[in-house]
Amino acid sequence: FVAINCGAIPLTLMESELFGHEKGAFTDAKETQAGTFERANGGTLFLDEIGELPLDAQVKLLRVLEERKITRIGGKKAIPVNVRIVAATNRNLEEEVRLGKFRLDLLYRLNVFTIQLPPLRERKEDIPLLAAFFLRKHNSLLNLSIESITPEAMDQLCAYDWPGNVRDLENAVQSAMILCVDRQIHSGHLPARIKSYQMERLIAPQEAEEDTSLRDTNSLAEKARILSALQ
């Protein structure tokens, strides 16, 4: 199993990362290197954020999927590969096709079996479980011993919209852990965007109510002026 994040690789290195290169193929190619397709041969290649793949690379990926062969950059020999492809994206690929950012033929080639995973904002019940998992994970990675997240901080995590989904939540928990000086994460340790989001939600209904009240007052005053003029 080999995983690659298509959104994290510079465009200039994308083809080399996927298909490999021969020694001397370009300036920094000091030795031959196998790409992810060769490394995943006989197994599974996970293409994360495939919606970020540039169009030129999409054409070459489609050719590999159809011919089951790759050619390294600077090479002439076609190398057979037998790879199962699993791809993921947070984009609407049908919309990307309409905008000319993703190839329709590649979408059809990949779209054999699809699993739609709802965004994190639509499965709030998962947030406490995921937050606890990330707490354990980063305790180990960062050599920390933070035990829990306070109910108030957890409420703020659950209320947030999470545009970046699970990765966004993990980054927020990790950031809070770095700032935490005791064994509990408090709301003050959370990123500012999460705290400000909560404040905006509290203020918005009040502003809407005040705005409605002001409109009603202005409307009554206008009616009074009209009636006075008619009399």
Residue spans of the language-model regions?
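A general lysine-centric signal
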Residues: Q58-K60, L144, K223
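Intrinsically disordered, low-complexity acidic/proline-/asparagine-rich linker or regulatory tail/stalk regions
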Residues: L18, P205-E209
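Bacterial C-terminal helix-turn-helix
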Residues: A208-Q231
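Conserved AAA+ P-loop NTPase core
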Residues: F1-R84, L93-N111, E122-A132
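Nucleotide-binding/hydrolysis machinery
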Residues: G74-R84, N92-R201, S219
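Ca2+-coordinating acidic residues in Ca2+-binding motifs
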Residues: E17, H189, R225
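Surface-exposed charged/polar residues within alpha-helices that form helix-capping/stabilizing sites
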Residues: G35, R63, E95, D155, ...
